[in-house]
Amino acid sequence: VTIVVTGAAAERQAALRQKLIRRVGEQQLTVDLGSPLYAAELSDAEIVERVACAGLRRGERRGTVRASAENAEQALSKAEVARVLDQLVSSLGPVRRVLLIPPDATRAHSGAAELTCALYARLASTANVRVLPALGTHEAMSEAQLRGLFPSIPLDRFLVHDFRDGVSQLSEVPASFVRHVSDGKLDYAVPCQVSRELTTGDWDRIISIGQLVPHEVIGIANHVKNVFVGTGGKESIDRSHFLGAVCGMESMMGRAHTPVRDVLNYMSAQLAPQLPLSYVCTVRKKDARGQIQTHGLYCGDDEGCFLAGAPLVQLLNLNLLEAPLDKVVVYLDPREFRTTWLGNKAIYRTRMAIADGGELVILGPGVRRFGEDPGIDRLIRRHGYRGTRHTLAELGQDRELAASLSAAAHLIHGSSEGRFRVRWAAGELTRKEVESVGYEWADPFALLRCYAPATLKDGFNGLPNGEKIFFVSNPGLGLWALKDDFARTPSA
């Protein structure tokens, strides 16, 4: 069990190996400096940080991968994707009952719907296959959405997750563990709750499908999150999200090893080993033509497939900038973003790159309310996005907010903490509504003419009036941060 470094001069390989051992400990790990993951211009310190950020910590179990394909420079071909799925299905052996768990319509860019249809086609001839979209706290998908995302799967094959009344509690992550991973910031247990469909279906295999991508609560989304949050219960979602908010999203986004992932990994390994879980994880990136392409596909039964894909996420989905941005304009596709609960990804994913005193303009023509859930919508309207200190103070005054910690976490995440301006141009919210929750209002129709998404490219743009902006066409595809600040944040 040792670290092997290849692809460079022997002297550099030996020196880098010692640095890696000091940073992550002795473990079975190969670092090929000839791989696109470790570009020639990276220093040894940057390579060590990249490995550490991927979650390869001292004593960590890497797990196994059933099937995978990866290409940092070119998108995977249809044949390569088909080969991986064929290998996965073959490795499962005979199965009678299979549950597929893809993300819902709010993750349409993940490519998971196509993979779900492909797996259904491979399995349905010999097995009873059902599909449970991982709604989390989101509203249920409509028939039109189901037909649009999963055209080849009959509607009677779909199940609906109810995070309030449709869950089973398996056990709980003890308070002592939460206290440890949060460095003493929190001292409560987190119940392990999953959809009752998982525990009562007599499944031979449960396959979770989704995209690995930087995320504000867990660091890198999907894998165990798709199961234990996407099909989780209210209290488990509340407490895990609040843990992320209290620990600070800026120290976690884009990181593979975070307190929230520690908690969800504990659930998977210690509290739910009886669930026959497998994972299908993608890594995707938008190409020069604006098409979102799959560059990595990893299948396995434990954290091995997640850890295999995490370095590629950091290579392709972290947009690290040399200097802070004065003005950022983010567009939210109305087919995907209909609430600030989802649309505030515009804030989460760009905040680390925005200059003090800078400006964020959010173009959300399809946004019609604040919360996905009526109760959470009511809490957002009552308390607004007014920063960490205000939200924590309100927790002591409002029992309803204290009983909905995921809403409190969202209020914290959705504030700039007064560091930069947020101008929200919501298509179906009034000026009074937008300003009542602490944002500056902007006219969506005027700004869509000024910043027409079809005329802008991702990144820096110069406008005819001389204005310079940084444009993001879909905040759900990555994280924008400063290179120096990101390198200095803790890898865990």
Predicted regions and their residues:
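C-terminal catalytic subdomain
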Residues: F337-R431
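Short internal beta-strands
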Residues: I3-V4, A127-T137, E359-P365, V422-A425
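Acidic, Ser/Thr-rich peripheral helices and adjacent loops at domain boundaries
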Residues: R17, I21-R23, Q145-R164, G371-S404, ...
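Extended hydrophobic packing segments that form well-structured cores
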Residues: A69, K78-A82, E417-A492
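Glycine-rich phosphate/diphosphate-binding loops that line cofactor/substrate pockets in enzymes
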Residues: V84-L99, A124, G201-D202, L318-K327, ...
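Conserved, well-structured core segments that form the ligand-binding/active-site neighborhood
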Residues: V160-P324, M352
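Histidine-anchored nucleotide/phosphate-binding helix
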Residues: A108-T126, G343-I354
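Short glycine-rich or small-residue beta-strand-to-loop segments that form or flank ligand, phosphate
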Residues: T2-T6, R97-A108, R130-G136, S208, ...
